[in-house]
Amino acid sequence: MRIVVTGGCGFIGSSFVNLINKVPNTEIVVIDKLTYASNPFLIPKDIPLIKKDICDITLDDIGYADYIVNFAAESHVDKSIHNGLPFVKSNVEGTFNMIEIAKQIPNLKKFVQISTDEVYGDMESRRIGEADEHTSLEPSSYYSATKAAADHLVTAAGRTYGLPYLITRTCNNY
């Protein structure tokens, strides 16, 4: 099993890499831009690391993948309020680029989009206790809006091109 993990040097991405690294017969390649939120020392030294923005990834970089797990994102809500452009570039354009490449990988088993519960908006004011795949998206920051846009792009690629995909919307971890 060959897995490409984008954003694999981030807090959650690196935890995933360390967990999946325990699975026998698994080859992992991490792609990370190595921004303020990354730490390459969080992943094992024997796992290949490509320092690259996901907007610049090519088929030559990941065309062998069985699975793509897309953790890469600008994720600081407060930073998105003051400057949304980096969020649009990474979360929307970067995800779009990854999708376009994934569509060209003949044996890709799954494109896993790591999203956020922020796409649902303020659950308290909406008086919703739980969200599921049918809950409407009501993002309230550029961060959550760009993650919702990325989710829609992944879904559209699945419906239009048959891209095998899964979207997870995790909640805040700490």
Indicate residue ranges for each PLM-predicted region.
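N-terminal Rossmann-like NAD(P)+-binding domain of SDR-like oxidoreductases, especially those catalyzing
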Residues: 1-173
